[in-house]
A protein has these predicted regions:
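Class I SAM-dependent methyltransferase Rossmann-like catalytic core
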Residues: 2-64, 72-74, 78-91
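Conserved beta-strand/loop positions that form the S-adenosyl-L-methionine
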Residues: 68
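Class I SAM-dependent methyltransferase SAM/SAH-binding core
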Residues: 73-155
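A short acidic, Gly/Pro-enriched loop at the edge of an enzyme's catalytic core
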Residues: 157-169
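A short SAM/SAH-binding and catalytic strip from SAM-dependent methyltransferases
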Residues: 166-184
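Conserved beta-strand signature within the Rossmann-like core of class I S-adenosyl-L-methionine
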Residues: 191-205
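Conserved class I S-adenosyl-L-methionine
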Residues: 202-222
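Class I S-adenosyl-L-methionine
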Residues: 221-272
Length: 285
Protein backbone atom coordinates (compact mmCIF):
# COMPACT_ATOMS: atom_id res chain seq x y z
CA UNK A 1 0.00 0.00 0.00
CA UNK A 2 1.54 3.32 -1.03
CA UNK A 3 1.57 6.20 1.43
CA UNK A 4 2.62 9.09 -0.71
CA UNK A 5 4.02 11.67 1.70
CA UNK A 6 3.33 10.84 5.35
CA UNK A 7 6.29 12.28 7.19
CA UNK A 8 7.26 12.86 10.82
CA UNK A 9 9.95 15.39 9.88
CA UNK A 10 8.64 18.07 7.52
CA UNK A 11 10.00 21.25 9.00
CA UNK A 12 7.69 21.81 11.96
CA UNK A 13 9.04 22.35 15.46
CA UNK A 14 9.02 19.27 17.67
CA UNK A 15 6.29 19.45 20.31
CA UNK A 16 6.25 15.74 21.11
CA UNK A 17 6.65 16.45 24.82
CA UNK A 18 3.19 18.06 25.03
CA UNK A 19 1.17 15.69 22.85
CA UNK A 20 1.00 12.77 25.26
CA UNK A 21 0.93 14.19 28.78
CA UNK A 22 -1.37 13.01 31.57
CA UNK A 23 -3.60 16.08 31.02
CA UNK A 24 -3.89 19.08 28.65
CA UNK A 25 -2.17 21.73 30.79
CA UNK A 26 1.30 21.56 29.15
CA UNK A 27 -0.36 21.55 25.71
CA UNK A 28 -2.16 24.83 26.31
CA UNK A 29 0.75 26.40 28.17
CA UNK A 30 3.04 25.75 25.21
CA UNK A 31 0.73 26.50 22.28
CA UNK A 32 -1.10 29.46 23.81
CA UNK A 33 1.82 31.89 23.34
CA UNK A 34 1.96 30.79 19.68
CA UNK A 35 -1.70 31.85 19.26
CA UNK A 36 -2.77 28.32 18.40
CA UNK A 37 -6.26 28.73 16.96
CA UNK A 38 -7.21 26.09 14.40
CA UNK A 39 -9.70 24.29 16.71
CA UNK A 40 -11.49 27.64 17.05
CA UNK A 41 -11.95 27.78 13.28
CA UNK A 42 -12.94 24.14 13.24
CA UNK A 43 -15.69 24.70 15.80
CA UNK A 44 -17.88 26.78 13.50
CA UNK A 45 -17.22 24.56 10.49
CA UNK A 46 -17.82 21.24 12.23
CA UNK A 47 -20.99 22.50 13.91
CA UNK A 48 -22.29 23.71 10.53
CA UNK A 49 -21.52 20.36 8.92
CA UNK A 50 -23.15 18.44 11.76
CA UNK A 51 -26.27 20.60 11.47
CA UNK A 52 -26.37 20.04 7.71
CA UNK A 53 -26.03 16.28 8.14
CA UNK A 54 -28.90 16.24 10.62
CA UNK A 55 -31.06 18.22 8.18
CA UNK A 56 -30.20 16.09 5.15
CA UNK A 57 -30.38 12.79 7.01
CA UNK A 58 -32.74 13.20 9.99
CA UNK A 59 -32.58 9.46 10.67
CA UNK A 60 -28.95 9.84 11.78
CA UNK A 61 -29.49 10.82 15.40
CA UNK A 62 -27.23 11.17 17.19
CA UNK A 63 -24.54 11.66 14.59
CA UNK A 64 -21.38 9.59 14.83
CA UNK A 65 -18.32 11.81 14.51
CA UNK A 66 -14.74 10.53 14.35
CA UNK A 67 -12.01 13.01 15.23
CA UNK A 68 -8.70 11.93 13.75
CA UNK A 69 -5.55 12.89 15.68
CA UNK A 70 -7.90 13.86 18.49
CA UNK A 71 -5.28 14.51 21.17
CA UNK A 72 -7.01 15.62 24.40
CA UNK A 73 -10.45 15.80 22.75
CA UNK A 74 -10.36 19.53 22.03
CA UNK A 75 -12.32 19.38 18.77
CA UNK A 76 -14.97 17.24 20.42
CA UNK A 77 -15.22 19.64 23.34
CA UNK A 78 -15.85 22.50 20.92
CA UNK A 79 -18.36 20.51 18.89
CA UNK A 80 -20.42 19.02 21.69
CA UNK A 81 -20.13 21.47 24.57
CA UNK A 82 -20.89 25.13 25.24
CA UNK A 83 -17.25 26.15 25.42
CA UNK A 84 -14.76 28.04 23.25
CA UNK A 85 -11.07 27.47 22.63
CA UNK A 86 -10.40 30.61 24.68
CA UNK A 87 -12.41 29.11 27.55
CA UNK A 88 -10.28 25.97 27.47
CA UNK A 89 -7.02 27.89 27.24
CA UNK A 90 -7.99 30.06 30.19
CA UNK A 91 -9.05 27.01 32.17
CA UNK A 92 -5.95 24.91 31.60
CA UNK A 93 -3.49 27.77 32.20
CA UNK A 94 -5.25 29.12 35.30
CA UNK A 95 -3.41 29.43 38.60
CA UNK A 96 -6.27 27.70 40.41
CA UNK A 97 -5.86 24.48 38.46
CA UNK A 98 -2.10 24.57 38.01
CA UNK A 99 -1.22 22.59 41.14
CA UNK A 100 -4.00 20.01 40.99
CA UNK A 101 -2.99 16.38 40.53
CA UNK A 102 -4.26 15.01 37.23
CA UNK A 103 -6.89 12.84 38.91
CA UNK A 104 -8.38 15.89 40.65
CA UNK A 105 -8.30 17.92 37.45
CA UNK A 106 -10.06 15.08 35.65
CA UNK A 107 -12.78 15.02 38.31
CA UNK A 108 -13.29 18.76 37.95
CA UNK A 109 -13.33 18.44 34.16
CA UNK A 110 -16.00 15.76 34.26
CA UNK A 111 -18.27 18.12 36.17
CA UNK A 112 -17.28 21.12 34.05
CA UNK A 113 -18.10 19.46 30.73
CA UNK A 114 -21.20 17.60 31.91
CA UNK A 115 -22.79 20.92 32.84
CA UNK A 116 -22.13 22.31 29.36
CA UNK A 117 -23.14 19.47 27.04
CA UNK A 118 -25.24 20.58 24.08
CA UNK A 119 -28.55 18.74 23.53
CA UNK A 120 -27.62 17.92 19.93
CA UNK A 121 -24.22 16.48 20.87
CA UNK A 122 -22.81 13.81 18.57
CA UNK A 123 -21.46 10.45 19.61
CA UNK A 124 -17.72 11.11 19.60
CA UNK A 125 -14.93 8.72 18.67
CA UNK A 126 -11.33 9.84 19.00
CA UNK A 127 -8.29 8.24 17.38
CA UNK A 128 -4.72 9.22 18.25
CA UNK A 129 -1.47 7.38 18.85
CA UNK A 130 -1.00 9.39 22.08
CA UNK A 131 -2.45 6.97 24.62
CA UNK A 132 -2.42 9.26 27.65
CA UNK A 133 -4.02 12.16 25.79
CA UNK A 134 -6.79 9.95 24.41
CA UNK A 135 -7.24 8.35 27.81
CA UNK A 136 -7.72 11.74 29.44
CA UNK A 137 -10.35 12.76 26.90
CA UNK A 138 -12.21 9.51 27.55
CA UNK A 139 -11.88 9.81 31.32
CA UNK A 140 -13.47 13.27 31.45
CA UNK A 141 -16.34 12.28 29.16
CA UNK A 142 -15.35 14.10 25.98
CA UNK A 143 -15.05 10.88 23.99
CA UNK A 144 -17.62 8.10 23.92
CA UNK A 145 -15.07 5.83 22.24
CA UNK A 146 -11.31 6.35 22.48
CA UNK A 147 -8.65 4.47 20.55
CA UNK A 148 -4.90 4.91 21.02
CA UNK A 149 -4.01 3.46 17.64
CA UNK A 150 -1.62 4.48 14.89
CA UNK A 151 -3.29 3.58 11.61
CA UNK A 152 -0.17 4.55 9.69
CA UNK A 153 1.47 1.50 11.23
CA UNK A 154 -1.21 -1.08 12.02
CA UNK A 155 -4.67 -2.15 10.93
CA UNK A 156 -7.57 -0.97 13.12
CA UNK A 157 -8.36 -3.16 16.08
CA UNK A 158 -11.61 -5.17 15.87
CA UNK A 159 -13.20 -2.80 18.39
CA UNK A 160 -12.25 0.24 16.33
CA UNK A 161 -13.57 -1.38 13.15
CA UNK A 162 -16.92 -1.98 14.81
CA UNK A 163 -17.10 1.59 16.03
CA UNK A 164 -16.16 3.08 12.66
CA UNK A 165 -18.91 1.22 10.81
CA UNK A 166 -21.55 3.87 11.50
CA UNK A 167 -19.47 7.01 10.99
CA UNK A 168 -21.23 10.09 9.61
CA UNK A 169 -18.39 12.63 9.72
CA UNK A 170 -14.59 12.52 10.02
CA UNK A 171 -12.88 15.66 11.30
CA UNK A 172 -9.19 16.57 11.46
CA UNK A 173 -7.55 19.90 12.23
CA UNK A 174 -3.85 19.39 11.91
CA UNK A 175 -2.90 15.75 11.66
CA UNK A 176 -2.71 15.43 7.88
CA UNK A 177 0.95 15.05 7.07
CA UNK A 178 1.57 12.99 10.18
CA UNK A 179 -1.19 10.67 8.97
CA UNK A 180 -1.83 10.24 5.28
CA UNK A 181 -3.31 7.88 2.71
CA UNK A 182 -2.59 4.71 4.66
CA UNK A 183 -4.68 5.94 7.58
CA UNK A 184 -7.53 7.11 5.37
CA UNK A 185 -7.52 3.82 3.47
CA UNK A 186 -7.88 1.89 6.71
CA UNK A 187 -10.64 4.19 7.92
CA UNK A 188 -12.64 3.87 4.71
CA UNK A 189 -12.18 0.10 4.61
CA UNK A 190 -14.00 -0.01 7.96
CA UNK A 191 -16.94 2.12 6.81
CA UNK A 192 -19.59 0.49 4.61
CA UNK A 193 -21.03 3.93 3.79
CA UNK A 194 -18.44 6.66 3.16
CA UNK A 195 -18.87 9.55 5.61
CA UNK A 196 -18.36 13.24 5.08
CA UNK A 197 -14.76 14.29 5.68
CA UNK A 198 -13.74 17.77 6.85
CA UNK A 199 -10.00 18.42 6.98
CA UNK A 200 -8.05 21.54 7.81
CA UNK A 201 -4.73 20.93 6.07
CA UNK A 202 -1.56 23.00 6.25
CA UNK A 203 -0.77 24.53 2.87
CA UNK A 204 2.69 22.99 3.19
CA UNK A 205 1.13 19.52 2.87
CA UNK A 206 -0.39 18.22 -0.40
CA UNK A 207 -3.94 16.92 -0.02
CA UNK A 208 -4.45 15.63 -3.57
CA UNK A 209 -3.47 12.00 -2.78
CA UNK A 210 -6.09 11.86 -0.02
CA UNK A 211 -8.72 13.56 -2.19
CA UNK A 212 -8.04 11.01 -4.94
CA UNK A 213 -8.39 8.18 -2.43
CA UNK A 214 -11.69 9.59 -1.15
CA UNK A 215 -12.92 9.90 -4.74
CA UNK A 216 -12.50 6.15 -5.21
CA UNK A 217 -15.03 5.75 -2.38
CA UNK A 218 -17.51 8.09 -4.05
CA UNK A 219 -16.64 11.31 -2.23
CA UNK A 220 -16.14 14.60 -4.06
CA UNK A 221 -13.65 16.93 -2.39
CA UNK A 222 -14.14 20.69 -2.46
CA UNK A 223 -11.67 23.25 -1.16
CA UNK A 224 -13.19 26.35 0.42
CA UNK A 225 -12.09 28.99 -2.11
CA UNK A 226 -12.76 32.16 -0.16
CA UNK A 227 -10.14 32.04 2.59
CA UNK A 228 -7.47 30.18 4.49
CA UNK A 229 -7.35 29.66 8.25
CA UNK A 230 -4.46 30.44 10.58
CA UNK A 231 -3.17 27.52 12.62
CA UNK A 232 -0.53 29.10 14.88
CA UNK A 233 2.52 31.33 14.77
CA UNK A 234 5.81 29.89 13.59
CA UNK A 235 7.84 28.80 16.58
CA UNK A 236 11.09 30.20 15.15
CA UNK A 237 12.76 31.36 11.96
CA UNK A 238 13.83 27.83 11.04
CA UNK A 239 10.22 26.69 11.05
CA UNK A 240 9.19 29.74 9.04
CA UNK A 241 11.74 29.15 6.29
CA UNK A 242 11.02 25.43 6.18
CA UNK A 243 7.38 26.32 5.56
CA UNK A 244 8.33 28.72 2.78
CA UNK A 245 10.45 26.01 1.16
CA UNK A 246 7.60 23.49 1.38
CA UNK A 247 5.21 25.99 -0.17
CA UNK A 248 7.62 26.60 -3.04
CA UNK A 249 7.86 22.86 -3.71
CA UNK A 250 4.06 22.83 -4.03
CA UNK A 251 4.07 25.87 -6.33
CA UNK A 252 2.56 28.15 -3.69
CA UNK A 253 3.57 31.56 -2.37
CA UNK A 254 3.59 32.89 1.18
CA UNK A 255 2.56 36.44 0.28
CA UNK A 256 -0.64 37.43 2.05
CA UNK A 257 -0.66 34.19 4.01
CA UNK A 258 2.33 32.56 5.74
CA UNK A 259 4.28 35.80 5.30
CA UNK A 260 2.19 37.12 8.21
CA UNK A 261 4.09 34.79 10.56
CA UNK A 262 1.44 32.07 10.87
CA UNK A 263 0.92 28.64 9.40
CA UNK A 264 -2.17 28.73 7.19
CA UNK A 265 -4.52 25.85 6.43
CA UNK A 266 -6.96 25.15 3.64
CA UNK A 267 -10.32 23.60 4.41
CA UNK A 268 -11.29 20.55 2.37
CA UNK A 269 -14.78 19.06 2.61
CA UNK A 270 -15.52 15.71 0.95
CA UNK A 271 -19.11 14.53 0.42
CA UNK A 272 -21.15 12.34 -1.93
CA UNK A 273 -22.20 14.21 -5.07
CA UNK A 274 -25.95 14.09 -4.22
CA UNK A 275 -25.26 15.81 -0.89
CA UNK A 276 -23.23 18.50 -2.64
CA UNK A 277 -26.07 19.06 -5.10
CA UNK A 278 -28.57 19.31 -2.27
CA UNK A 279 -26.42 21.71 -0.25
CA UNK A 280 -23.56 23.45 -2.07
CA UNK A 281 -20.51 24.36 -0.04
CA UNK A 282 -21.10 28.09 -0.55
CA UNK A 283 -24.46 27.78 1.19
CA UNK A 284 -23.19 25.40 3.82
CA UNK A 285 -20.33 27.60 5.04
Amino acid sequence: MSNTTANDDWGKANFNDIYDCPDPRPYFATLGPLEYQIPHHGQAVFRALAHALRCLHPDRTPLNVVDLCCSYGINTALLNYRVTLADLSTRYTSHRLSALPTRHLAAEDRTFFAARRRPEAATATGIDSAARAVGYARAVGLLDHAFAENLEVTEPSPALRRTLAGTDLITVTGGVGYVFTRTFTRLLDSMPTPPWVAAFVLRTVPYRPIADLLARSGLVTEKLPTRTFRQRRFADSAERYAAFDALAVNGLHAAGKEADGFYHTDLYVSRPAPDIAALPLARLL
